[in-house]
Every structure is written in structure tokens, then in C-alpha cells.
């Protein structure tokens, strides 16, 4: 895809969820500092990105045709210049209403070492909220 996206380090937002980049930074990413660090040997490295109802944000580009394809390599560069590489494996989409934070699909500090990039999807025009989430999984390349 050829995307060079800055990565912010974030904690929890005002609702207690892992933070996201500011809405004005549509092509930035946000690493949740309470998840394993990029390059870790275990668990989900949680990264959040935005998608917009009218397109034109990183999450839209990842999901829509021409976006991430199985086997694509994602390079994550830390503040000290260290590089961790991941190979995109799959994406899942699920309704927010059925999500269980204890399921391990997003929060997982002990499982296989992988990126878990999440974006919101299916904006509800009535409520202004997003009814679905998409998680893109990429395995750590050693």
C-alpha cells in the first residue's frame, strides 16, 4: 500500500477504551501503551486507526479493495528507530453490540505475537456512532 503513517503512544480515552489518534490525524496510528510493545514476543500489539463515513482515512484504505492483502508486510518503527515487521494474515468484522472484551480477540497479552489494528466501521447516521469494528491481524516476522 505504501503508507507511511506516524504512530502516537496513547492510554485510555474518556470512555476507558484504548485511545485513537486525534480525529484531525486521519492517517496516524495510535499504539495502546498498555498492550505489548511492537516487536514483543507475545500478545496483541494494539494499534488503532480512524475510518470516516465518507472514506479518506487510513482505516478506509486498509479495509477497502486495494487495501491490505494476505502476505503484505507491515513495518512498525519505534521512537528509537527499532523496526518490527509483521505479515498481514486476516481481518475480522464484528458488531460492537456483541463484543466481549474478555474474548481475547483484541485484548490479549499472552497469545501469539501479532499486530491487532482496529478501526471503527458502519457509521450509524441516526446515532453518529459506529456499529461495527474491524480488526486486522498480522503475525510477527522473525
PLM region descriptions:
Residues 1-142:
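Solvent-exposed, non-transmembrane regions of membrane-associated and secreted proteins
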Amino acid at each position: 500500500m505504501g503508507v507511511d503513517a506516524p504512530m502516537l503512544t496513547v492510554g485510555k480515552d474518556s470512555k476507558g477504551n484504548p485511545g485513537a489518534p486525534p480525529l484531525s490525524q486521519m492517517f496516524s496510528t495510535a499504539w495502546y501503551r498498555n498492550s505489548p510493545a511492537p516487536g514483543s514476543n507475545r500478545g496483541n500489539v494494539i494499534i488503532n486507526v480512524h475510518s470516516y463515513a465518507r472514506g479518506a482515512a487510513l482505516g478506509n484504505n486498509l479495509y477497502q479493495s486495494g487495501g491490505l492483502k494476505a502476505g503484505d508486510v507491515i513495518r512498525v518503527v519505534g521512537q528509537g528507530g527499532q523496526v518490527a515487521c509483521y505479515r498481514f494474515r486476516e481481518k475480522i468484522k464484528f458488531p460492537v453490540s456483541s463484543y466481549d472484551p474478555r474474548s481475547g480477540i483484541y485484548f490479549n497479552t499472552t497469545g501469539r505475537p501479532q499486530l491487532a489494528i482496529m478501526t471503527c466501521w458502519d457509521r450509524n447516521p441516526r446515532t453518529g456512532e459506529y456499529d461495527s469494528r474491524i480488526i486486522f491481524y498480522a503475525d510477527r516476522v522473525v
